[in-house]
């Protein structure tokens, strides 16, 4: 399958489940490879990931649920809770974030471009997320 075919096959999976053909270690390997080989401005590689499986995955979604329970109106919480339950039903969670220490260091090192690094960092994150999403097409229910 070509890269463009992978892009065309990429879809949001709403019915998340635990039927996954890969081990957590294999999933982490695919994700790390995709992120590590994603281009970034000045080869800054600011994108970071956290993968959660098993109990830590469930704990994360319980934290999200209880946090949102405090701010979402009670009348709307049922729908919010259903969405959280659908995410918690998955095999794991991948969290993306940007290493702000690296961004700040680049801003100091290349002062002329300082205002651009936060934006470029977000671009890097988008590219990394796209790479992971597209790589997942090669695997069943990643």
Where are these regions (language model features)?
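Short pre-catalytic strand/loop immediately N-terminal to key active-site residues, enriched for Gly-Thr
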Residues: 115-124
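Short glycine/proline- and charge-enriched loop/turn segments
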Residues: 11, 109-116
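Conserved coil-to-alpha-helix start sites within the AMP-binding
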Residues: 123-131
């Amino acid at each position: 399958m070509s890269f463009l075919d992978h892009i065309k096959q990429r879809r949001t999976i709403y019915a998340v489940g635990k039927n996954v053909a890969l081990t957590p270690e294999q999933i982490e390997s695919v994700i790390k490879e995709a992120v590590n080989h994603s281009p970034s401005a000045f080869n800054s590689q600011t994108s970071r990931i956290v993968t959660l499986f098993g109990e830590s995955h469930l704990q994360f979604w319980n934290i999200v649920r209880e946090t949102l329970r405090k701010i979402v109106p009670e009348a709307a919480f049922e729908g919010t809770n259903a969405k959280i339950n659908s995410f918690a039903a998955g095999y794991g969670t991948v969290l993306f974030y940007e290493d702000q220490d690296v961004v700040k260091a680049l801003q100091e090192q290349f002062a002329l471009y300082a205002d651009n690094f936060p934006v470029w960092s977000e671009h890097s994150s988008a590219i990394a997320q796209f790479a992971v999403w597209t790589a997942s097409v090669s695997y069943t229910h990643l």
